[in-house]
Amino acid sequence: MVAAIIFVTLVLFIFFGDLYIKNQVEKYIPAKGSGKNERELLGGRLLLRRHHNRGMMLNAGEKKQSAVAVVSLALTAVLTVVFFISLGHWGNNLLRAGLALLLGGAFSNTYDRLKRKYVVDYLSFGVKWKGLRKIVFNLSDFCIIIGALLAALGMAD
């Protein structure tokens, strides 16, 4: 029971934490083209930006926003069911931690797609390679990537 509470709390922490950051970015970082919309963090290793992603990862599907939103909602719903089923079983905390990270990120990005009609991305890596430097992420993206890895490792046990 304690583990279930911890994992549900993790989902909520990711969702509300990322939502708070996204709202702050929308409020305080100017839109691209309307002033300085990039701030350096950690000595320039990270860049804080404001980017509206109307598709999926790397803006894929941006011309089919409705389809992207429906797929996002459907996958999030399935993931929610799998997550709650996993909470009813003993053991395999690695799988549950991965699912919690995935679900927190999925809730946040799906919420954006449905509410704002775009996902707010705000972090880039301050590297010399322009291909990587121009990609903009958010906390939920990192949680989804790490969560998928942990869930896969947890399923391999």
Residue ranges and their predicted role:
Residues 1-157:
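Alpha-helical transmembrane bundles and membrane-interface segments of multipass inner-membrane proteins
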